[in-house]
Amino acid sequence: MLQVRRWSGFLALGLLLVSCRDGSDPVSPTLAARVDQGAQGSREQAARWFEAASPEALAVPGAVYADLREESNRLEFGVLHLGAEAAVRAAARRLGIPDDAVTVVLAEPIVQMASLRDKWRPTQGGIQIHFGLYLCTMGFNADDGTQRSFITNSHCTNKQGGVESTKYYQPTSTVDPTVIATEAEDPTYFKGGVCPRGRRCRYSDAARALYSSGTSSSRGIIAKTSGPNNGSLNVTGNFTITSQDNTTTSFGIGTTVNKVGRTTGWTQGNVTQTCVNVNVSGSTITQLCQSIVQNPGGAVVIGGGDSGSQMFQITSGDNVTLVGIAWGGNSSGTMLVFSPFKQIQQELGSLVATQ
């Protein structure tokens, strides 16, 4: 269920935590088409052979999997190389299993897929965090002087604006009840001056959490999925923050920016409006001088739970420049709003986010 805060067509996007379980998808290996032909034994005989052969075959270096193929009553073993094939066949012969009851195929290694929603130590930008009943995204790790911290949204605290010592968990308190960090800085929203009558304002939807001493973190690292706007949450590498934009508040129209968040993964779009004053729907909050991003192809760029995602520009390869923090968007997720990094520092103080 989404935590939805409506304001003038935009949404502040956190995610209500109801329950969590392991949602990993099974891995389907890609196999070479090398299959031996031979006699088929009875199902009962094949099952006895498989029970004996599986542990022996999987003990062979280079073995990938063991399977009893129900449609043929044959034993199938996946291996990485021909050397392993010979060893697997020898193991089967020692058990008295005829060669024509055994199939060996070349298989790719099967690896565990780590998701943005899994437990990560050291922590890094883009992964899931949990507080209270809600889920958000860890934006980026940063040092505030000697204080090792991470930055997320102000609305990803127990109360938006002001410090209530919100406790954070990763990925959730049910998976790991260790408090990884505690809210340390979240300026109150101001009234008057440039702030519209009857509303409360800030220039960034950002808060800082101070890490617990026992939690390891990687400054300057953002989790990277397989590609932009493809919906994948599986981490395939990382981006490195090599620079941070301490000066820009108004980004050029058409500037390409990216984010990584726990719900929609790595998304990319272009700045379509810059230094926009935005009313947060369903609240009295106005965020001043924000940037708006859309994907030219209409792709979804943000979803519930992506709140807190870092915003960055790719400079070369996997090296990136940190430019801000995402906090909201429209109901369809095709538009996101972010606070420039310069304004985050104006409100939270000097931060070092580079590796």
What are these regions (language model features)?
Residues 1-9:
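Bacterial N-terminal signal peptides that target proteins for export
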Residues 16-19:
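C-terminal motif of bacterial Sec signal peptides marking the signal peptidase cleavage site
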Residues 43-62:
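Short amphipathic alpha-helix segments
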Residues 58-90, 94:
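Short glycine/threonine-rich beta-strand-turn micro-motifs
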Residues 123-287, 313-314:
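Serine endopeptidase catalytic core focused on the charge-relay Asp
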